């Protein structure tokens, strides 16, 4: 099991990884972060709104399901938002350079990081 810092460090080992954060969904605050290329405090707050919106939409549609991850594909970056299966109310925010990363490996890395994270 890995603590938050170890989880961030592990996420950043993937080729093309730029930055990562563990975010509290209720407050939008980072519980831990690392890497560079973005202001992770602003990104955490903004992507908390993405999470809240998706949950609200799922409820309105009557979807009785869970979110594995949310992928936002930009021209030069991938942004992966993965709600934790280990700790309710927390998500992993993972940013990768699109030209240097493998999306399938990145999604798997986020899944494994979540499974091994302890609070």
Spell out what each predicted region is.
Residues 1-119:
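Non-catalytic interaction/Regulatory regions outside core domains
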